[in-house]
A protein has these predicted regions:
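Signature of long, low-cysteine stretches enriched in small and polar/charged residues
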Residues: 95-150
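Well-ordered, non-membrane alpha-helical segments in soluble/globular domains
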Residues: 90-99, 188-195
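Secretory targeting signatures
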Residues: 1-10, 203
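Short coil-to-beta-strand
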Residues: 157-161
Length: 203
């Protein structure tokens, strides 16, 4: 039986504002040749959540920024001569469908794929990203929250997956809050750059 993969974790110096909310090892999907296992770490930006909760007097106590990593393993192991990079074209469509399903499971609506791009991680690795738009209904709030979400898949000897989601508008603007706290004033571009910084930190 194959050993489950080690977790893909954020370095300690990237943890500011983030906390681990879940860690698990699970079968992600089945292929004709066997099962794909994943060691998952899910992070939430607690600093943003706390700032929003405080300024709404507890009216909105909800995850509005998330980041997750998964390192994949194969059961049984890949046969000799088959590298993880050779499997990625098969895995990527499965990962996209799985991520869309998970966004729906989080209660998000209007989930749709809106684009793709590539970025470089270090000198030798490129990651192919898929962008999604979604809406968080935010139970208990008077307005909804539009989100931009991402899925990235790449190899570095193993197959890695990273996902994220964040608001597309400053939270202070969306909820008409007078906020000096930086977490509530960040734009979609700010969030996007932080997401890419987290990706690069995984190298």
């Amino acid at each position: 039986m194959a050993t489950d993969p080690d977790p893909l974790e954020l370095p300690a110096d990237e943890w500011e504002g983030w906390t681990v909310v879940d860690g698990s090892v699970e079968t992600l999907f089945e292929l004709p040749t066997g099962r794909v296992r994943g060691t998952v770490r899910q992070y939430e930006n607690e600093r943003t959540r706390e700032a929003l909760r405080e300024l709404t007097d507890g009216g909105i106590d909800h995850t509005v920024r998330f980041f997750a990593t998964t390192r994949l393993g194969f059961e049984p192991p890949l046969p000799p001569g088959t590298t993880p990079a050779m499997i990625v074209p098969v895995l990527r469509p499965e990962a996209r469908q799985s991520f869309a399903d998970r966004l729906h499971d989080r209660g998000l609506t209007n989930v749709e794929q809106t684009g793709r791009e590539r970025i470089r991680l270090g000198e030798d690795t490129r990651i192919r990203l898929t962008r999604y738009a979604a809406v968080d209904p935010l139970p208990g709030a008077e307005v909804e929250l539009p989100l931009e979400c991402w899925l990235g898949v790449w190899t570095d000897g193993t197959v890695n997956v990273a996902t994220s989601g964040y608001p597309t508008v400053p939270l202070a603007t969306q909820f008409d809050l007078e906020a000096d706290d930086q977490p509530l004033r960040k734009s979609a571009n700010d969030y996007r750059e932080e997401f890419r910084s987290l990706l690069r930190a995984l190298q």
